[in-house]
Amino acid sequence: MASLSGSWRDAYKGMSSDNIKGLVLALSSSLFIGASFIVKKKGLKRAGASGLRAGSGGYSYLLEPLWWVGMITMIVGEIANFAAYAFAPAILVTPLGALSIIISAALAHVILHEKLHTFGLLGCVLCVVGSITIVLHAPQEQEIDSVLQVWNLATEPAFLLYAAAVVGAAIILIVQFVPQYGQSHVMVYIGVCSLVGSLSVMSVKALGIALKLTFSGMNQLIYPQTWVFTLIVLTCVITQMNYLNKALDTFNTAVVSPIYYVMFTSLTILASVIMFKDWDRQDGTQIVTELCGFVTILSGTFLLHKTKDMVDGSSSLGNLALRLPKQLEDSNGFEQEGIPLTLRRHECTKSPRPMRQFILPQDGPEAV
């Protein structure tokens, strides 16, 4: 028993001061980013009512003040997130983004009038429990004293292979799939955001380390590698924002937020493990515990997504009756599952047997 207790003490040595700073910054980031999703969604709706929608290639949202409020809120959150990566490993910082989904769900309940089911509340609890598990078992930040050291990690064969695969997949999605399937399949836009996002996080961490070292008296701005990382960050962030705007404007927030989180976080953790070798400094128990925490967060986001528009105490037919009118009103013609209603109607007209679409209000079905 004593040896077992000693092994646990060796495995868990507490959080370092840098990890604590990164944790506080990551929590602040989740607060701002979660709020920005709702504010930007409202701005995109307003802009779409008076001009070409972002999902159709329009940029009228750039003239909408509310969208800019959401954008500034997101920028503040991203700055806090940027700083968090300079102090803590990506395995600690990135999964905490699930808290932004909780904040987004709470604000959607208040502002967008999207009811939160009891199982949605359970999903929030699971996200918090999973986040705490990861925080308690996250690896300590690697000691890095120069941006050249980060550059050496980024140019190792394993990470170069990963980066090439990500860039290739993103280009294929943009060129081949976005024009044909972007408006009907949510995974296309989010796939581009997530793939590019994993590279942006690695570059953000490298740039954050360079700035942290510069502010501490070791100037890293004299190295060209610092500016290469800066260029990569700008390119990736612009690409992310463009396709994230398209996803938010085309599909329901309840669909975009959890799927984007799952894909982005999974790819970022994979990139961090390859580049910074975070798991090389941990034993099997800690790694498995972190993975369990991550799976717990995924379970929470799944519950939040699946029960977003369910009403407590309603039967399945009752839920359908309450959900269909809401989707038609809140999603601007798009179904909750991410498929545009116009496409579904078009498919119905192609059917050899005529089909009638029913809208089910609470007092009974009515054919339209």
Curated annotation (Swiss-Prot):
Segments traversing the membrane: 19-39, 67-87, 91-111, 116-136, 158-178, 190-210, 221-241, 256-276, 284-304
Localization, UniProt: Cell membrane; Early endosome
Entry membrane topology: Multi-pass membrane protein
Protein name: Probable magnesium transporter NIPA3
Function: Acts as a Mg(2+) transporter. Can also transport other divalent cations such as Fe(2+), Sr(2+), Ba(2+), Mn(2+) and Co(2+) but to a much less extent than Mg(2+).
Family of this protein: Belongs to the NIPA (TC 2.A.7) family.
Keywords in alphabetical order: Cell membrane, Endosome, Ion transport, Magnesium, Membrane, Transmembrane, Transmembrane helix, Transport
Cytoplasmic face of the membrane: 40-66, 112-115, 179-189, 242-255, 305-368
Coiled coil regions, renumbered to chain: none
Residue ranges, Extracellular side: 1-18, 88-90, 137-157, 211-220, 277-283
Molecular function (Gene Ontology), one example: magnesium ion transmembrane transporter activity
Cellular component GO terms held in the UniProt record: early endosome; plasma membrane
Keyword flag Transferase: no
Superkingdom of the source species: Eukaryota
Quaternary assembly: Homodimer.
GO biological process: magnesium ion transport
